[in-house]
């Protein structure tokens, strides 16, 4: 394989570009898929940039991954269209694989899409795609956040870092929701007897929440009646003593009155 063919395998064609898109912006965008050597936007005779560009990667495996990750992303409201460069081995594999799928009987319009053809590439490309397939949506969001931030502030395009700030709030909310649901479920699953035991463990709960009759409800009827009879017995003795005292006082008075008459 010659040097030109090797460079073609590491290059992507990016079309449908807005006139505001610059080489620095494309460098920052495609750097999310792997190390980028250079980005070239050709110009016409008048010096105006054309609506397509070439992105050259350092590693060949970054080419199919960049197509799967960034194809269709909108820049300034216009979705970009990524294709393999003509003459590369990726483009020839895409053409050769599209015909067997068509003759098998799969008439789906997405049978020849880049995402389907990438799955049938070399084992190294398949391994990379499988390793990133689970986090593809997160990486696409991170790429757009990074690009929008660069476009908003107009900063210099250097070595990019994935913006992970969009992931932490969802993780915290999930943890918070899980903690609330688990705590509420624990409160619902706790038996009522255990809650009563915890309430009765406080030394003053009984005095606060129960009246005198409820506090003495555990006493036996015999003991309660015995105490009540004792009080009545004392009352009867007191009444009997006062009655005898009144009789003696009355009899004494009557005796003196009788003695005085005689």
UniProtKB/Swiss-Prot annotation:
The modification N-acetylglycine is found at residue 2. PROSITE patterns: RRM (PS50102). It comes from the Eukaryota. It is found in: Nucleus, Nucleoplasm; Nucleus. The keyword Nucleus applies. GO terms for cellular component: nucleoplasm; nucleus. GO terms for biological process: meiotic cell cycle; regulation of alternative mRNA splicing, via spliceosome. Phosphorylated at Ser-133 by MAPK14/p38-alpha-activated MAPKAPK2/MK2; this phosphorylation is stress-dependent; this phosphorylation decreases its RNA-binding capacity therefore affecting RNA nuclear exosome-mediated degradation. This phosphorylation mediates YWHAE and YWHAZ interactions. CDD domains: RRM_RBM7. Residues 10-87 form the RRM domain. Residues 25-35, 59-76 are annotated as: ZCCHC8 binding. GO terms for molecular function: 14-3-3 protein binding; RNA binding; single-stranded RNA binding. This is RNA-binding protein 7. It comes from Bos taurus.
